[in-house]
Amino acid sequence: MYVVAITGGIGSGKTTIANQFAELGIDVVDADVIAREVVEPGAPALAAIAAHFGPDVIAADGQLDRRSLRERVFSDPDAKVWLNALLHPLIRQEMFGRCAAAHSPYCLLVVPLLVENKLTGLANRVLVIDVDEATQIERTCRRDGVSREQVQAILAAQASRAERLAAADDVLDNKNGAPETIKPRILALHETYMAFASQQASQV
């Protein structure tokens, strides 16, 4: 399966762009969705997290209390290492499986922290959704109802714009964000990826 990874910083519009590829019939695998699924009630990973951190990280309804876990991990680097060692292999395995099971000519793999977690090798091609920092801050504040300072803290913890662009095979400028502006570029990329996927399939 030919895999195109799509990444970008917070507020860049990754989900919106991925949805437009989905409308073209392309299977989309989202790392964030998988990350939530592997810690659902009944999942072995959730039991391991509860055993390691204690019952405080489990909410009354049996779901993972993400805020409580975030606070524990934020203040304890060793805890973050342990958690990543547990979850990242599970998420990666599930991403591989879903990409392999895709039925479209190529698969779109949405990984927000592709560069940060050094996962560019998972894909045949990397598409970076690029916007400037001011746009990221404005969109995220409006979408999530958070302060500029909170968004800036998230940005500081993510790869820089330059680091993401250095990892890109293709770049989609999404500063405007208007569908009519983006659609022609998406269609052009789609045709390119279809051709690459066809070429790969013919070599198998």
UniProtKB/Swiss-Prot annotation:
Location of the DPCK domain: 3-200
Gene3D superfamilies: P-loop containing nucleotide triphosphate hydrolases
GO biological process: coenzyme A biosynthetic process
GO cellular component: cytoplasm
Compartments where found: Cytoplasm
Annotated disulfide bonds: none
UniProt keyword annotations, A-Z: ATP-binding, Coenzyme A biosynthesis, Cytoplasm, Kinase, Nucleotide-binding, Transferase
Xref: Pfam families: CoaE
Catalytic activity: 3'-dephospho-CoA + ATP = ADP + CoA + H(+)
GO MF annotation: an example: dephospho-CoA kinase activity
EC number(s) on file: 2.7.1.24
Binding site for ATP: G11, S12, G13, K14, T15, T16
Pathway this chain belongs to: Cofactor biosynthesis; coenzyme A biosynthesis; CoA from (R)-pantothenate: step 5/5
InterPro entries to which the protein is assigned, alphabetical: Depp_CoAkinase, P-loop_NTPase
N-terminal signal peptide: none
Role: Catalyzes the phosphorylation of the 3'-hydroxyl group of dephosphocoenzyme A to form coenzyme A.
Family annotation (PANTHER family): BIFUNCTIONAL COENZYME A SYNTHASE-RELATED, DEPHOSPHO-COA KINASE-RELATED
Family per record: Belongs to the CoaE family.
Protein name according to UniProt: Dephospho-CoA kinase
Gene from which this protein is expressed: coaE
